[in-house]
Amino acid sequence: MKKSQTGQYDLEDRTFTFAKNVRALAKQIPKTASNIEDTRQMVRASGSVGANYIEANESLSKKDFLLRIKICRKEAKESRYWLRLIDTGDDSKVKNYRDELVQEATELTSIFGAILRKSESNYRENPKLEIRNKFK
């Protein structure tokens, strides 16, 4: 992942990489009936994390920003759920890759939760405070 000049990871890049990695995993898992449906859900949820983060950064209001960040957190949690359901078969390499993605989904959930708590706190303290793009 690419770091910004301040040494922090670009969250837009991180969510994009997460979605791409989930798609890479989808190509490696056994094509069972349950995996096919679970994979569809997993791919949708993982892509939605980054898409909603982009929408949050382009939000027109504070309420819209908070709503989009909540959706990001929800989709990251959902991604984790679908990742955990996937049957990796007997391939330990695929299982380890899946476990890394479960960890990344957990970290993204925590990051969006922290952004949400900080933003809601700032919003309650000063409702006129502009919070758009603060975490970009």
Where are these regions (language model features)?
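Short, C-terminally biased terminal segments at protein or domain edges
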Residues: 1-55, 59-136
